[in-house]
Amino acid sequence: MARIAGVNIPNHAHAVIGLQAIFGVGQTRAQQICAAASVNPSTKVKDLTEAEMEALRDQVAKFTVEGDLRREITMSIKRLMDMGCYRGFRHRRGLPCRGQRTRTNARTRKGPRKAIAGKK
């Protein structure tokens, strides 16, 4: 198994699909990385030469991925919460912060329903 940015890339996958195993690399960015490294996107990872793997590693290193990206996202949310703005307040409460309704729905963000004693 090849390792790029601390992630094991599956050998059986095509290069463009294998790169998407890295957090922060989607379809478009994976295609850009393959093009910049002059690697055929449909080549299987196990068939890549060491020079091609090194070129892919160099291209991936130019982007913010994996731990650095996760840390950046966490720090952005923490900054909003420390600032005390509306979005930070919603993050702190565990509610949707992009204007969705919460009277009904929003179960993903709010978690499972909490039982309330019914009227008797």
From Swiss-Prot:
Pfam families: Ribosomal_S13. GO terms for molecular function: rRNA binding; structural constituent of ribosome; tRNA binding. The keyword Protein biosynthesis does not apply. InterPro entries: Rbsml_uS13_C, Ribosomal_uS13, Ribosomal_uS13-like_H2TH, Ribosomal_uS13_bac-type, Ribosomal_uS13_CS. Residues 96-120 are annotated as: Disordered. Keywords: Ribonucleoprotein, Ribosomal protein, RNA-binding, rRNA-binding, tRNA-binding. GO terms for cellular component: cytosol; small ribosomal subunit. Gene3D superfamilies: 1.10.8.50, 30s ribosomal protein s13, domain 2 (4.10.910.10). GO terms for biological process: translation. It comes from the Bacteria. Part of the 30S ribosomal subunit. Forms a loose heterodimer with protein S19. Forms two bridges to the 50S subunit in the 70S ribosome. Belongs to the universal ribosomal protein uS13 family. Located at the top of the head of the 30S subunit, it contacts several helices of the 16S rRNA. In the 70S ribosome it contacts the 23S rRNA (bridge B1a) and protein L5 of the 50S subunit (bridge B1b), connecting the 2 subunits; these bridges are implicated in subunit movement. Contacts the tRNAs in the A and P-sites. This is Small ribosomal subunit protein uS13.
